[in-house]
Amino acid sequence: MTKHTRRTFLRTTASAGAALFAKALGASAPNHRPSAAPLPAGALPPRQTEDVLFLAASDPGYAAARQPYNAGVLLRPNSIAMCATEAGVQKALQRARAEDWPVAVKSGGHSFEGFSLNDDGLVVNVSPMRDLHLDPHSGLLTAGAGCRLREVNQYLLPQGRFLPSGSCASVGLGGLTLGGGYGMFARKWGLTCDHLRSLRMVDGTGTIQDSADAPDLLWAARGGGNGHFGIVTQLTLQTRPVPKAFSSWKFRAYHLDETRATALLAAWFEATAALPDDAFSAWIMNGSQVTILLTTIGPAEEKAVAAFRRQLAALSSKTSAAPVVPLTKSMPWYYGPPGPEYFKNTSAGYYRGLDDIRAALPGIFFEVLTKPGLVFQINTMGGAMAREKTEGAYPHRAWPYLGEAQAYWDTPFRASNLRAAIGRIRDHIAKAGITRHYANYPDLAFEDWPTAYYGQENYQRLQAIKKRCDPENRIRHPQSVRLPG
């Protein structure tokens, strides 16, 4: 059992009056307490039990429990339910129904558009549910939905196991997995959701569901998005052996204009097309500078990797190589800032290659070159992601590249200008005919977001699950799956 238990959580929130859950905290299998008993019509659950603490806006601890990673999200729920068990989640749903409140779900709080919060409703915060257990024989990891990636890595890596996922340390495992989950190792092993073997969930009616009894829930949880029709409490995922080594290089080019940036991007697309599955690359433009990241868990002198390094080094102003180190030492290099931050990030679509994005590049490059704080990035996908046969709702396996547009600021004036620039980049992307987007990089301005994130057929299937699991549309956000009809 990991040290990241509910007891750890309560120590850190004791100032909020959270000396609750006292009995449950010592349990070794904390999520599987008896189901919450039904309440009489109109009755409210107690404000504090061993399973859940309801925080009002005036309570100490509310601000910390509400805080999203995106500091610009100002939504303020009426109450935040800090849930330590499935029974606590059930009690939270009971209160939401009694108060007729909408429900949002918060784990890591990294939703770009603040979908883990709402105004005047209830937020079910599962961050106390952070127990981790690794079966040493099967390599299966059972994790509470509130676990963060840093905790997962710190738990698994010393045991010689690894879960392919993203790199941001404070991202919640639940949200990452449900939306897909990709990173530097997805080309080798597939998406995080491809490793999902089972889950437990409290649906919108307050009923505990197990994917062993409802296989369509497992299908939906493999890339079908977050906050639609249930609150995941526990995930079981297949881990991998830790790679023996990790190598990385950065190639930097300075003082670029549109012509040189386009030429460098064309060379990058050509070089990445030949990379082995062990390798990952990202092309990142910030102002007039481009940084290209290359990583591999395979041989550093593998033919295609060596060719990539030679080709990109010849076009770059500076090349640097990190020491070859175990993954336990290299992962923290990519953890990113702890947050919160002021930003506006959005999916910039999936591509098959340069031709798909070429028409949008002049407009994108103009914005990035003239607006400090803007970043345009393209990441390699493909590899095992394209070959994976696991049944799931993630629909974009055939596209080997994923773009993202990012803006960061520290003053309101810059926020307005950069948000407008992101909007223009989004328009350039749409006019180029790019319509597929990653659900974990949402944007409220996407017009046909159901098709963009999930595809039409998958979305209709998700709607059928919504109708069964949340017929009152209790769990919702601006881009949650709608009830059919």
Give the ranges of each region predicted by the language model.
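Soluble FAD-dependent oxygen oxidases
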Residues: 2-485
